[in-house]
C-alpha cells in the first residue's frame, strides 16, 4: 500500500510540475516584457524660455525675450514676449491637446498676437488640427499645427527646442 501511495504522489507531483513550470516561465516572460517596455513620453510640465538663437549665432536672453509654456494633461498655455529694434511683440495661446508617439493634435481655445507695428490679432474660433510625431533616439519632433508655429523637438532630457528655419531656435528649459 505504501508503494501505491508514493507512486500516486509522484504522478500527482509530476502532473503538477509541468503546469507550474509553464506558469513560472510565462510570468518571467511577462515581467521581462513589462520591464523592457518604456512608458509613453510625457510633455507635461512648466517650461521657461532660456534663450533664442538667431541665424547669425547671436543668443538673445531676458529681458529682450521672455517666455513660459505649460502643458497640463490636456491643455497648453503659451506666452512669449520679445523686443526687436526696441519694439515689443508678444504671442499668447491657450489650446486643448493630445499627444502620443504618433500624433499631436490641438483644439484652439484662444490666440492673441501683438506684433510691433501691426494691429492686434485675436482668434477664438474653434479649430481642430493634427500633426505627425516623429520619434527618434528618445526625442519627439512635432510641426506645431496651429497658427504657423515652429517645429518643436521634445528632448529625452525634458527640455524643448523650437525652431523656425532661417528665423530662430528657441531653447526651453523644463522647470523642476
Can you name each region flagged by the protein language model?
Residues 1-2:
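Methionine residue identity
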Residues 5:
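Short polybasic linear motifs
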Residues 34-92, 100-176:
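Lipid interaction determinants
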Residues 12-22:
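Bacterial N-terminal signal peptides that target proteins for export
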Residues 23-30:
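Bacterial N-terminal signal peptides
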Amino acid at each position: 500500500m505504501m508503494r501505491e501511495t508514493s507512486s500516486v504522489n509522484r504522478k500527482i507531483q509530476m502532473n503538477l510540475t509541468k503546469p507550474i513550470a509553464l506558469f513560472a516561465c510565462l510570468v518571467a516572460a511577462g515581467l521581462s516584457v513589462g520591464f523592457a517596455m518604456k512608458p509613453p513620453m510625457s510633455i507635461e510640465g512648466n517650461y521657461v524660455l532660456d534663450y533664442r538663437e538667431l541665424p547669425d549665432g547671436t543668443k538673445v536672453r531676458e529681458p529682450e525675450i521672455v517666455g513660459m509654456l505649460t502643458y497640463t494633461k490636456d491643455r497648453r498655455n503659451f506666452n512669449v514676449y520679445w523686443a526687436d529694434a526696441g519694439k515689443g511683440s508678444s504671442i499668447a495661446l491657450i489650446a486643448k491637446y493630445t499627444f502620443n508617439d504618433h500624433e499631436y493634435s490641438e483644439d484652439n481655445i484662444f490666440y492673441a498676437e501683438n506684433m510691433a507695428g501691426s494691429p492686434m490679432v485675436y482668434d477664438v474660433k474653434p479649430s481642430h488640427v493634427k500633426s505627425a510625431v516623429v520619434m527618434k533616439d528618445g526625442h519627439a519632433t512635432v510641426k506645431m499645427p496651429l497658427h504657423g508655429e515652429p517645429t518643436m523637438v521634445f528632448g529625452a532630457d525634458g527640455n524643448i527646442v523650437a525652431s523656425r528655419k532661417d528665423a530662430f531656435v528657441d531653447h526651453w528649459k523644463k522647470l523642476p
